[in-house]
Amino acid sequence: QGYSSAASDVYKRQLMDLKLMPLYAILDPELTVGLPPRTTATTGMDALTHAIEAYISWTYNTKESLRLAEEAVKLIFDNLELAYQHGEDLKVRENMMIAAFKAGFAFSRAGVGNVHAIAHTLGGLYNTPHGLANAVILPIVLEDYGEAVYPKLARLCEIAGVKTDGTDAEKAQAFIAEIYAMNERMGIPKGFDFIKEEDIPQIITWALAEANPNYPVPVVYNAARCRKVIDTIRAKAAENLPAEA
């Protein structure tokens, strides 16, 4: 899959064809040693978004895609912050590449969801880096989904080692809280203040058209619910630390 956005067109389009699927993937951690910490953090959270959105997919999962998503989440929780702090560590770089590969395999089968649908609009309209957009939007959308995703998020919470006791709701909420905490520790903002009020109707139109029926989302958004999420993304910008961009 690839993406294209012409200079005169702010809509981010997906290009998908079997001919674009690689026969081999070369995972060489030495190629990522020079990746800046900021980009390491946001691309790692992008991989986490791939894994989680694939895992909570409503219909398209297989046993293999579920397993790969679980393994990706575990690897990312164990290695991303280490890669952010110690970019020269080839082992954690290798683990993150494996995690990204597994998450990519999972979402190629099971799809993504509303996080990506909204993130793509921000990339097209404001040139927001894709990983940064996903990192900020992911916990907000997961909170909005609520009980619809508690059982699966509770399972991921256990796998990630965040919390192993309590109810599904408690574990799911702890998992989401840890995503927020990971973002904060890596200097990723809580929200975006650049989303213009006049752009919101277009954002909603594009996001809804992409997510439904293309993605097997656990919660199908209407315009009002999508607007609520976008309002939250904007409101949370007030909580950003001074160093956050």
Predicted features and spans:
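Carboxylate- and glycine-rich phosphate/diphosphate-binding segment that chelates Mg2+/Mn2+
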Residues: D9-A110, P218
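Single conserved hydrophobic/aromatic residue that forms the stacking wall/gate
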Residues: Q1-A7, Y11
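C-terminal catalytic subdomain
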Residues: A110-A174, Y180
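Short helix-capping/linker segments at secondary-structure and domain boundaries
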Residues: Y55-N61, A110-V112, D144-P151, A237-L241
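Alpha-helical scaffold segments in soluble metabolic enzymes
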Residues: A47-A54, R67, E71-L82, N95-I98, ...
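C-terminal charged capping/lid subdomain of soluble metabolic enzymes
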Residues: L153, K163-A245
